[in-house]
Amino acid sequence: MLKSNNASETAAHKVGDKTAKKVFFRRRKGCPLSVSNAPVIDYKNPELLIKFVSEGGRMLPSRITNVCAKKQRKLNNAIKIARILALLPFVFQAK
């Protein structure tokens, strides 16, 4: 009796699979700072760091910038140091 139940369950799953919608996953691009000619992450380079800071002055998360975890940590530390040395503002003023 158990075998017949399992057979009917698998048949139901097969039918359900055909009607199920396909899920489309967009392939993530690689880290823009890990390519061969990428700029070096340094607190003395505010032009690079400002690209990873929001309009309000907050650091953008890696899911938005597509930066790998290792480079995200380096970016966060560089932004913090640049703020302390007054190379970057802590809060951007509204225009």
UniProtKB/Swiss-Prot annotation:
Cross-referenced Gene3D superfamilies: Ribosomal protein S18
A single GO BP: translation
Pfam families: Ribosomal_S18 (PF01084)
GO molecular function: small ribosomal subunit rRNA binding; structural constituent of ribosome
Keywords attached to this entry: Ribonucleoprotein, Ribosomal protein, RNA-binding, rRNA-binding
GO annotations of cellular component type: cytosolic small ribosomal subunit
Keyword Ribonucleoprotein (UniProt): yes
Summary of the function given for this chain in its UniProt record: Binds as a heterodimer with protein bS6 to the central domain of the 16S rRNA, where it helps stabilize the platform of the 30S subunit.
Subunit organization: Part of the 30S ribosomal subunit. Forms a tight heterodimer with protein bS6.
Similarity annotation: Belongs to the bacterial ribosomal protein bS18 family.
Protein name in the entry: Small ribosomal subunit protein bS18
Gene name, Swiss-Prot/TrEMBL: rpsR
